[in-house]
Amino acid sequence: LKEYADIVQTNSNLLLQLISDVLDISRLESGKLQFNYEWCELVNHCQNMITLTNRNKTVDVDIKLQMPKEPYMLYTDPLRLQQIIINLLNNALKFTPAGGSITLDYEVDEEKQCMLFSVTDTGTGIPEDKQELVFQRFEKLNEFVQGTGLGLAICKLTIQYMGGDIWIDKSYKNGARFIFSHPIKKQESTEK
């Protein structure tokens, strides 16, 4: 009986996630998704995301923030940034076997005036012919892995709405590396 209850619970959670994902895409496309920008300290914010992901993992995978990092204030929507990064971390977790690692990193690209975030794993990787498909709705690389196939589409739309872009690092061959850009703004420029 417990086994059936667990199956019902799992399927209920998947259905709720699917509904939530479809609503997010609908809000993004109609311009009705709310963005609340504020100054956010990245080291603590990223470390909190790592802690959250570590708490929910079911496989022994090392998830870490690339260190050392200097404190950095980014003008962003902290909730949307968290949604993007946790989605990327959770995807990496799905495809990284026990004993593997996942690294969250970020660096300023002064020339392009953006922050570059990356999530790198030592998982199964993504075949080259599938790399552009992963950002399409309902696209799943593996039908046996849980998920709606909407997470990366939501990430891409959200990142584009915030003025950035997302892509797969084709040069990385030891798993998968997703990189996304986020515009930066100087703190002084917003003070009056």
Predicted regions and their residues:
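Helix-loop junction within the histidine kinase core
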Residues: 26-37
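A conserved beta-strand-to-alpha-helix junction within the catalytic ATP-binding
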Residues: 36-51, 82
